[in-house]
Amino acid sequence: MAAGKEKKKVVRSTAWTVSEPLGTRYPSTIDTIPTNYHANFVQWMVSDAYAGTGNYGSQGQNQIFFDREHASEFFFEDNLPYVLTVPKYKFYNSGRPMTIIGYGFGGNKYSSQDRLNIDFSGNVNKKLQFGAGIDYIYSKGSYENQANKDFAWQVGSSYTGDRYEVQAFVSGYNLTNKENGGITDDRYITDPAKVQGGQTSVDPKTIP
């Protein structure tokens, strides 16, 4: 008598985002493959034509006009792509508890940068889901008085029934950025010997 084959049940996981103001659902992805993973930890992850102050986690602007997001009511956050907005928030339905952790680091002792992402999602049943996450960025910068520390958190939930759907989330952030005002003389970069009495090597942290 042949032994019966054991059936394995595959739990299908889905992800989606919603649009403003009607909350229309758009299918999204659950990124667990480290393809181009490094691109998440550079300032130019926003766009190939991105202009920033040179430090990860600081302000910047997409130079492709038609790819820019619409101006928000609080315009100070428009130049901070790390701030979570409604279209950026992902809802998950994983069936089982799921945690996605990402950590990236680079630089040396004086110019290190770190980013930690944690996303959690768990289901009460097939229709009701809860999620939470944090995003922490700490970067010292390449120049003096350029360090920043960004911390953001979010908590969300969704209900997908036969007749009704509800998606909601709450988020907050605390961003601390130093501003050095720029370099006083471009020759510290283009021709350092002229402004340093013949010395060609430059310590970025000492440039006035």
How should these model regions be labeled?
Residues A71-P81, T85-F120, G141-S142:
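Short strand-turn segments of transmembrane beta-barrel domains in outer membranes
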Residues D48-A49, G141-D150, G156-P208:
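Outer-membrane beta-barrel translocator/channel fold
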Residues S94, N125, T160-Y164:
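Outer-membrane beta-barrel channels and translocator barrels
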Residues D114-Q154:
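Surface-exposed extracellular loop regions of Gram-negative outer-membrane beta-barrel proteins
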Residues I101-F105, I134-Y136, A168-G172:
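Transmembrane beta-barrel strands of outer-membrane/channel proteins
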Residues M1-R25, N180, R187:
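Cleavable N-terminal export/targeting peptides
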Residues T99, F130, Y164-A168:
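Transmembrane beta-strands of outer-membrane beta-barrel proteins
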